[in-house]
């Protein structure tokens, strides 16, 4: 609060990024327009938009690191600034001074809130409640009637807390008038004369679920669409389309330059879209992906449900030379996390319906088009020293039903030393397939769901066939029993030998229909140059 007050008085024009805001390449971007004091509400908005904020009066030992060190102090400063603006007469500063004197060289039983309440009484009862509030806040305003110079606006409180609400009224000459609505809880209609625009919570003293509904005018506000290179912060008065140049590659499409178009900003919003068109230099065709996502965060933090996500996605690329594929995959994902936000425990329950349409070749393929209903459960708990992951997968198709579980454990038992263990168990409950296209793979990723970035997905030999994806059997070596159409049990492990050099081993039990159980074994050296991104076996 004191820093906000100091900057406001002595450096009101200080930009958040200082002199860099004047650089020609960024001077028109939203973040270059932010003042120094805007950082407090920006960081608060970023965390609140992810549904991981915590009440200001939470005990320190219950706060996450980011909330303890950054967000809650920022929110506290903004809250005191709102009280100071609402009450006036420098009441906050006087209470801070009194509290400092009472605690000079001695320890007093009185908290700052005790002193503040003593000096202001019931005028700040709402403030005490705000410190404890742990839910979404959202106010909105819209015009409901306009007769000559008399206009009526409806202000709605879409949350369950009573707060004083600051509003700014502007006329045609852009002259502004500010007033407060005291203890705002229920919906309110206000009459405005000779003003043509109203803004609620103009200083953004508290984070809201949606700031775009904080503006209204006697005339319909026409938002312009702006194309913005790279991501930026949201401008509530414009529709922004962010675009980023992209370059992708696979063996059949060649180099694919393109663009990624999205509405994603650092402050998350409920609905996000991403279009990624690209041009195949090898096929001379326009390809790409489209993804739509709607996130509904659970405002009730007394249960473990964190969010519900709705996805719709589609893509088109080539799986062989001159043979294209198209996918369509709607899904619902339920995300769970511990009520103790400091816990790293996460759970995900998802349901996907994947439709694949493959261009047929002259030799014909048994499954050019197919649909799979996929259920997945993931439980993970990771820390700096240890990482645990459990995944259960269940797939249903008209010709097969298969289920699998995967267990991963990684332990950094010393500096730059680790060991890891992975167990995979997969079983066909029903299998009427004609070939091994949907079978469990012992050493190659069978990406018939087209969800993995394989550079040469149809290659059986050569450099591109050696791309390793840790799935199913998880073997790095090519073995005689490539597939399992009944069940497979695979155990893989590794341990650090020296710095980024590791030894690995694996053993697998592979069972095919009408064949005896077969055991396979492997061992070798892993060059762990960049974990999970660049490794050589």
Predicted regions, residues:
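C-terminal outer-membrane beta-barrel translocator/porin domains of Gram-negative envelope proteins
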Residues: 12, 309-320, 327-333, 359, ...
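Conserved C-terminal beta-signal and adjacent last beta-strands/turns
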Residues: 489-497, 504-507, 523-531
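Transmembrane beta-strand segments that form the barrel wall of outer-membrane beta-barrel proteins
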Residues: 177, 181-183, 239-251, 257-259, ...
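Solvent-exposed beta-strand/loop surfaces of large extracellular or lumenal domains
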Residues: 164, 168-188
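Outer-membrane beta-barrel initiation region
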Residues: 182, 188-194, 199-304, 333-335, ...
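C-terminal beta-signal and terminal closure region of outer-membrane beta-barrel proteins
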Residues: 455, 516-537
């Amino acid at each position: 609060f004191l820093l906000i007050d100091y900057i406001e008085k002595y450096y009101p024009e200080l930009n958040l990024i200082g002199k860099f805001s004047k650089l020609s390449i960024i001077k028109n971007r939203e973040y270059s327009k932010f003042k120094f004091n805007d950082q407090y509400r920006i960081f608060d908005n970023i965390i609140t938009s992810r549904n991981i904020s915590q009440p200001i009066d939470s005990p320190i030992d219950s706060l996450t690191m980011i909330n303890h060190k950054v967000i809650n102090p920022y929110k506290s400063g903004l809250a005191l600034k709102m009280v100071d603006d609402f009450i006036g007469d420098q009441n906050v500063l006087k209470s801070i001074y009194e509290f400092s004197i009472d605690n000079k060289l001695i320890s007093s039983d009185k908290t700052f809130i005790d002193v503040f309440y003593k000096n202001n009484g019931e005028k700040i009862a709402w403030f005490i409640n705000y410190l404890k509030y742990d839910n979404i806040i959202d106010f909105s305003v819209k015009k409901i009637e306009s007769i000559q110079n008399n206009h009526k606006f409806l202000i709605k409180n879409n949350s369950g807390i009573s707060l004083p609400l600051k509003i700014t009224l502007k006329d045609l000459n852009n002259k502004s008038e500010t007033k407060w609505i005291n203890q705002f809880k229920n919906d309110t209609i206000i009459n405005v004369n000779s003003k043509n625009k109203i803004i609620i919570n103009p200083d953004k003293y508290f984070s809201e679920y949606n700031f775009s509904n904080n503006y209204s005018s006697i005339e319909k506000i026409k938002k312009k669409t702006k194309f913005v290179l790279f991501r930026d912060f949201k401008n509530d008065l414009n529709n922004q389309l962010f675009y980023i140049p992209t370059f992708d590659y696979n063996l059949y499409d060649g180099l694919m330059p393109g663009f990624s178009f999205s509405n994603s900003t650092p402050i998350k919003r409920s609905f996000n879209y991403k279009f990624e068109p690209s041009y195949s230099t090898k096929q001379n065709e326009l390809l790409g992906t489209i993804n739509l996502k709607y996130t509904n965060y659970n405002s009730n933090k007394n249960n473990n449900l964190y969010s519900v996500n709705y996805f719709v996605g589609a893509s088109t690329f080539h799986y062989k030379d001159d043979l294209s594929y198209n996918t369509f995959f709607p899904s619902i994902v339920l995300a769970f996390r511990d009520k103790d936000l400091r816990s790293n425990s996460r759970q995900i329950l998802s349901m996907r319906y994947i439709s694949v349409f493959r261009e047929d070749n002259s030799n014909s393929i048994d499954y050019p088009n197919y649909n799979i209903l996929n259920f997945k459960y993931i439980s993970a708990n990771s820390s700096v020293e240890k990482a645990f992951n459990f995944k259960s997968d269940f797939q249903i198709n008209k010709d097969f039903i298969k289920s699998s579980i995967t267990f991963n454990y990684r332990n950094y038992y010393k500096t730059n030393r680790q060991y890891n263990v992975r167990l995979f168990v997969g079983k066909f409950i029903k299998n009427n397939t004609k070939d091994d296209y949907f079978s469990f793979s012992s050493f190659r990723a069978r990406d018939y769901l087209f969800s993995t970035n394989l550079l040469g997905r149809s290659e059986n030999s050569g450099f591109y066939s050696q791309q390793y994806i840790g799935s199913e059997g998880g073997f790095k070596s090519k073995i005689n029993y490539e597939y399992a159409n009944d069940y497979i049990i695979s155990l893989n492990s590794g341990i650090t030998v020296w710095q980024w050099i590791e030894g690995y081993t694996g053993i697998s039990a592979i069972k095919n229909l009408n064949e005896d159980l077969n055991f396979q074994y492997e061992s070798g050296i892993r060059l762990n140059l960049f974990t999970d991104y660049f490794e050589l076996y």
